[in-house]
């Protein structure tokens, strides 16, 4: 698989879980002999929701909730078959969304 590239995108709400998962992927890939670029932090997506506190009136009184989505990008250059096998077997938390291209 010379000259090829694997791109891994990670998404999670918890920044500690995504950083630990990225660290685990980088350690696994470097152990198998492939080159790694990253993890590159991508912009954090922030969704803010305003909810009326009262069930009936007082529309001016609102409560704000936010949800942050953290993203990381990892590129694996010149992956070996051993690298691909190790990536398939890696155990990551369920809270981290992994997209492999």
UniProtKB/Swiss-Prot annotation:
Coiled coil: none
Entry GO terms, CC: ribonucleoprotein complex; ribosome
Keyword Manganese appears in the UniProt entry: no
Keywords: Ribonucleoprotein, Ribosomal protein
Pfam family, one: Ribosomal_S10
Gene Ontology molecular-function annotations: structural constituent of ribosome; tRNA binding
GO biological process: translation
HAMAP family on file: Ribosomal_uS10 (MF_00508)
Functional summary from the UniProt entry: Involved in the binding of tRNA to the ribosomes.
Protein name: Small ribosomal subunit protein uS10
Organism of derivation: Corynebacterium glutamicum (strain ATCC 13032 / DSM 20300 / JCM 1318 / BCRC 11384 / CCUG 27702 / LMG 3730 / NBRC 12168 / NCIMB 10025 / NRRL B-2784 / 534)
